[in-house]
């Protein structure tokens, strides 16, 4: 989503519908040309994104490599100092993780990344169509008092998945979960297996 990140940063979200229209037009034209690849626009954008400069500040890359889970906490008013004190005390124990406070540029980068990453699974499916069967997408809500919130799939199910992407809403236990399924597996059957697991956990979907 580096191209999406830069596009929104420099052009703005108000022009996104025009971008999507242009992508759709390019794909329609490409379908009429036998030498053009499937999902032309996605593959073209992914290719051009490799020529773009690094879009994230180094500290975000460091945290990406260091930690599996990341939380964007946006505070205002008196809550800023309250959060600052709480996080300082909580992460005094380094085994619990770490945090950093954003200036305006870092905050913008974090929010743009949050927006751009939402289409990551779709882009991956288009670019790696030979390895990907499809995407299983679930919106789930766990119990409010659920402490074991991170999903652990059984190996026989996990082995059918190339990548898992989780996007959550802090403190309400609502998640959007994208599963990129390996080529050759039945996505409907996999989804049914996942829903059975969610039923056992008392989740809603």
Q: Where do the protein language model's features map onto the residues?
A:
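Conserved glycine-rich FAD pyrophosphate-binding loop
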Residues: 3-205
């Amino acid at each position: 989503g580096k191209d999406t990140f830069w596009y929104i940063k420099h052009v703005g979200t108000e022009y996104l519908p025009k971008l999507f229209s242009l992508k759709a037009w390019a794909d329609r034209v490409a379908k009429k040309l036998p030498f053009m690849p499937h999902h032309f626009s996605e593959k073209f954008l992914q290719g051009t994104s490799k020529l773009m400069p690094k879009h994230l500040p180094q500290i975000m890359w460091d945290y990406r490599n260091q930690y599996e889970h990341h939380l964007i906490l946006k505070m205002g008013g008196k809550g800023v100092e309250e959060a600052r004190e709480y996080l300082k005390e909580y992460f005094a124990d380094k085994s619990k993780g770490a945090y950093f406070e954003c200036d305006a540029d870092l905050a913008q980068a974090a929010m743009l990344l949050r927006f751009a990453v939402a289409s990551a699974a779709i882009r991956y499916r288009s670019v790696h169509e030979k390895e990907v069967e499809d995407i299983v997408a679930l919106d789930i809500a766990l119990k409010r008092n659920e402490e074991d919130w991170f999903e652990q799939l059984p190996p026989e199910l996990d082995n059918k998945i190339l990548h898992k992407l989780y996007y959550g809403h802090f403190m309400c236990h609502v998640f959007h979960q994208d599963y990129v399924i390996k080529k050759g597996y039945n996505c409907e059957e996999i989804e049914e297996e996942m829903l059975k697991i969610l039923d056992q956990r008392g989740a809603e979907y």
